[in-house]
Amino acid sequence: MSFTFAIIGRPNVGKSTLFNRLVGQKLALVDDTPGVTRDRREGEGRLGDLEFTIIDTAGLDEGAKGSLTARMQQQTETAIELADALMFVFDARAGLTPNDRAFADFARRANKPVVLVANKSEGKAGGIGAMESYALGLGDPVQISAEHGEGLSELYDALRAIMPEPEVEDDDEEIDGLTEEDFSKRPIRVAIVGRPNAGKSTFINRLLGEDRLLTSPEAGTTRDSIAVEVNWKGREFRIFDTAGLRRRSRIEEKLEKLSVADALRAVRFAEVVVLMMDSQNRFEEQDLRIADLIEREGRALVIAVNKWDLVEQQGGQIAQLRADADHWLPQVRGVPIVATSGMLGEGVDRLIDAIQDAYAVWNTRVSTAALNRWFEQAVAQNPPPAVAGRRLKLNYVTQTKARPPSFVVFCSRADAVPESYLRYLVNSLRGVFKLPGTPVRITLREKANPFAHKRKRKS
């Protein structure tokens, strides 16, 4: 069982910077604006030979009951309950504030080991602030600079002192490599994206059965891409809830630009992407832009039309959604569409089934024999057009990879094959081998002519 630390403290003391430093990558947004982190996020931390789970939390701050700030504090309290020990972080340059003192009491009442971290300890002011912290009664402060990586050896000593001795692994249990069965047990990486306030976090909370992610009628509540582990009927998923993606012209605030970049990274890391639309405003321009991005990144796509409980006269609406999707998104024709209600918990089973089906399609490999039978029939049924009086010759096709399914067609003149004919081949292949909603790549390549050098020498 992994040892878990929760990083706590008031807003803007450098908790997310420390989190990023310990996990070794920028998983949490960092900005000078207080309150950047809203949800709690988890990562696998490492410091020297120490390995542990680490939870980054929203800054502990006061807030009216039911407000976004109060719910941020509730997330922090939950993180403290889950943790084995706490890292209480304060800003040594700013010195102790009344909030630091109040929440130091809060940390003490948790009755868990506490590592007092004096962040931003560079310079004389930082040293003075660190000395002040003895008044908190939480032991010796560890003076660090999370931004510059200073003081990490001292932090290592403090963490090592409260962590249990690592268990010695049995040498007989070495893993030589993943089998097909092992691969099938890997968590499917899923990103849930969409415009702001489409209901992404509400839906994931319904899936988890807990208020794991902050939700609010205010658009843009989620700022980071938050990853959660889900076991649904024996299948593991790693689901990323992302910040809403707006049109570039509307992304004005620096912090929102960071959030959008974080969401795009989640899409690139995912295997299946769920594009969540609001049932009251579906297939708007930004939805289509997001779908196009997902296709260009080569990810499997599932469309979830959320807040379906708000739709009046639902009969026939799904058929209309299918027609709209195939019209506006021909590049992923047949994309799975699921009507959901995160608020009521409707459509969860159907969406999970659609994700698993999309993942299977994304991993499709077609046998060479079946592929070439299709190819011969497709070319015979609709031959490529002639160019300058000479018919193009398409020789054969081969699959180069899955994830997404990608193929190479060898032909006489690759640059002369029109885009319309390439689309014909993609749609035909998609229909015959049942590849709905996943990007299908076909690349044209000219077959080497073994007699070309002889002709060249002759002339």
From Swiss-Prot:
GTP 1 binds at residues 9-16, 56-60, 119-122. GO terms for molecular function: GTP binding. Gene3D superfamilies: 3.30.300.20, P-loop containing nucleotide triphosphate hydrolases (3.40.50.300). GO terms for biological process: ribosome biogenesis. Residues 364-448 form the KH-like domain. It comes from the Bacteria. PROSITE patterns: G_ENGA. Keywords: GTP-binding, Nucleotide-binding, Repeat, Ribosome biogenesis. GTP 2 binds at residues 194-201, 241-245, 306-309. HAMAP family: GTPase_Der. This is GTPase Der. It comes from Rhodopseudomonas palustris (strain HaA2).
